[in-house]
Amino acid sequence: MRKIFLLTACCLSLSLPMRAQHHIVLSSKLDARAAQLLSSSRLEQSANIVHAYITLTDDAAKAQLEQQYSIRFNVRCGDTYTAVIPRSALSAVAADVRVKALYVGEQMKLMTDEVRKQIHADALQSGSGLSTSYTGKGVLIGVIDMGFDFTHPNFADATGHCRILNVWDQNAVVAPSGAYGYGSVYNSPAAIKAAAHDNTSATHGTHVAGIAAGSGITLYGGMAPEADLVLVSTNRTEQGIVDGVDYLLKYAKQTNRPIAINVSLGTMMGFKDGSGLMARMVDSLLTGQQGCLMSVAVGNEGNRNSTLIGRSVKSVWKVPAAGADQLFVETRPGDSCSVRLLLKDKNSGEVFFDHTFSTGKIWSERYDSFGSADKTRASLVASCIKNDVTGAYAISFHVGYSQQSSEEWSVEIESTNQRVFAYSNNGYFSAEGYEGYVDGTNSSTVAMTATGNEPIAVGATVSKNRYVSISGVETIKPWAISGRYPLSALGPCSDGRIKPDVVAPGASVVSSYNSFAAARTVKGADVVYRKTVGGKTFYWYVENGTSMAAPTVAGVMALWLQAKPTLTAAEVRTLLAKTSYYNSSMGQLPNNQYGMGQINALAGMRELLNTTSLSEIPTTASALYAYDAVTEMLSTQATRYIFVYSIDGQLLLQTSHQNLSLSGLPAGLYLVRLIGLQGEEIIKLRK
């Protein structure tokens, strides 16, 4: 019956002309979002600045453009920079011959108790079965997020002092401070206390930071309760995330401390082989770093058939009711493709939009005034970009159109040689019963931002499936404990690499709530704990998602960094491969649901301690040191870390300072490991 209707509709469409539409050819330098900004008077006019990637024709152009347009260039990767451009200068910058490309990228989405027990982080904090306890002391945890409550007791130490050392609020509207040309930096306890919070509309960052480094004053402590925090309140742009990573790495270097960074935001749009601008820039910042680790959420799209994969595919593109969606069609290197977008009335067959877009060269176009009832607001911006690393083409679409219930979009993709990957940002793909059409898949729903080679990409499992609010309301979820969280995004990457790298508890996770946020930001049934400190009541609540799983991993990595401050991402992957938890329901690992399994903090620590025995540490640098028997103080020069071991290899003391008191140790012979800027050295010291 459906086939007969389809044939009738096709015949009708032949007899009805397509309604007129307005078509504008735009600069080929622009991606779809940049084209939107430049070609529309409605979008983001209130913003004084625009965050973008700028690719230059040569090095000399940078200083010239800075002076001419007051551009702030920040992080560099090859000939491309993250940049802050005055909104009034955007058109002129885009037209400047010294600018090879100007891409705005996509807006980031938020990737939104029992956890410590399930991954055995509680055993590290208590020191169970180990020579010492591990709480993250001496380690930094950097969180790039939004909705931070700097006053929450979850971020205080045992004496009540705030463990947040530094904050960069990228959204602060006061006069910019810091090196990046936007936002404000709070770099003292007084400034952080005075600011109190970054905004009153979100609480995500307070929850995420609490998972990674909550103080443990309640049952709902974080993974690394004695780690210090450095926060970046993000503007949710790709460039803001890259600049934030750069900021945190520089802060760690300036303070001579190891750092674990967490990013629980991302976007589905972009090249998913790790070669996209954002993934590539983050990789360039992290590559070769010791003691600088990063976790990133894979996203919560695992329940949505938002991906089309194939050489020749047709499907109905189910755009959300709000009418706004983005589509990114990625070819493999050396291939080409065409994409036909069709908007029609299912009943009458009337066609409102029909155009075929092709790769082979870079271009950017805008279409307006199509459709039926919403013609005046209808907008479709499309651009074809070429990856300057792999040479692969992609076509990006930004659609804004409130379609009628009888209208639908369809997409037809044809490639020359290899499979094409198409991703819908907010919608999904469905065959709708049409002959020759296919449903979308939830494969390759991993966020573009989690496809890099350096960060650890984290999926989510279920920590618990029932909880009771402080008002007595019980919530029961239809999830299997320790099973994959149904929304946790799946791999593989478009180049075949497995993602996620690892999974961690991320569903029904309890953590702290931004006390400055409006009550509507959290449902009352999800608030499970409260505590009054200094006359003010603070709350803890339940949230779900890979946003919660990623900081679990960041916190565990902080514990591992406490044991080995020079730990690398490659070493972390080895630990995960050897020690992650496995059960038969996960299937053969690694796979694109669970990665290498669920992180096991204790097993990873034991493996780390076993593989960094004193006998394996080379003597590559001579550190200057002296021991004062009267004061029992060990003093060193040019060292980053000091570790003191018993003669049988048990770790007894450690510090990231150049001086260490041994007054708490009994008389005897000890081994002291000194890590300097040029290498490591082991000395014997008799007290």
Regions found by a protein language model. Give the residues of each.
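C-terminal outer-membrane/trafficking sorting elements
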Residues: 616-687
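Positively charged n-region of N-terminal signal peptides that target proteins for export
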Residues: 1-4, 687
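C-terminal subdomain of the subtilisin-like protease fold in secreted/lumenal serine endopeptidases
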Residues: 39-43, 255-276, 285, 289-300, ...
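Catalytic-core segments of hydrolase enzymes
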Residues: 164, 259-354, 360-361, 398-513, ...
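Subtilisin-like serine protease catalytic core
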Residues: 21, 128-241, 256-257, 289-293, ...
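Hydrolase catalytic cores
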Residues: 209-212, 217, 230-241, 246-260, ...
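Autoinhibitory N-terminal propeptides
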Residues: 4-6, 11, 17-132, 140, ...
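Active-site core segment of subtilase-fold serine proteases
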Residues: 148-206, 222, 347-427, 517-518, ...
